[in-house]
């Protein structure tokens, strides 16, 4: 699987792999998955709404179903998947909810993460960050640290999508890999 890795970087104690996650994932070992898959690919934000006149135009196939390899990659591995309520995962006993206490009125008041954890659902009240990092759906660092708190025995965390790197920063701050 190393041939599928385009580039490898070290950031602190973290290992960042550049490549197609669908090809790389089979050769990796990890204790848990914490991720926020991309969604709304091909859509443009227009005044706080998603293409208000033609709501369904512009969505790519990615948005219509879970990546076929993701449920298999999860298997029995503890997992937290943001946006999982939009994907056809099995029923969950434990949903994590981020209550955006200062959400923009035209956007969602909260976000949900699907988990395969055997515990009651939980909610975190946390303001939406006002810092612009160039990523349209960046999760707050405190939110990702909260997620890692549900996985105390997981030392190696997989985030196959990376996004703005918030999971990586949370892992670094919490002594995870």
Regions inferred by a protein language model and the residue ranges of each:
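Class I S-adenosyl-L-methionine-dependent methyltransferase catalytic core
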Residues: 1-158, 162-177
């Amino acid at each position: 699987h190393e041939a599928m890795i385009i580039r490898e970087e070290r950031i602190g104690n973290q290992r960042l792999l550049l490549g197609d996650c669908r090809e790389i994932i089979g050769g990796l070992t990890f204790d848990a998955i914490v991720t926020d898959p991309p969604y709304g690919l091909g859509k443009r934000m227009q005044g706080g709404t998603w293409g208000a006149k033609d709501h369904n135009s512009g969505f790519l196939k990615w948005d219509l179903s879970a990546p076929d390899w993701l449920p298999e990659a999860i298997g029995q591995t503890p997992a937290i998947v943001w946006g999982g309520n939009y994907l056809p995962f099995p029923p969950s006993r434990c949903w994590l909810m981020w209550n955006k206490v200062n959400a923009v009125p035209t956007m969602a008041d909260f976000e949900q993460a699907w988990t395969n954890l055997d515990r009651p659902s939980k909610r975190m009240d946390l303001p939406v960050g006002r810092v612009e990092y160039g990523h349209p759906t960046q999760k707050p660092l405190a939110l990702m640290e909260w997620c890692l708190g549900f996985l105390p025995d997981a030392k190696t965390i997989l985030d196959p999508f990376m996004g703005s790197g918030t999971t990586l920063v949370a892992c670094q701050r919490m002594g995870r890999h």
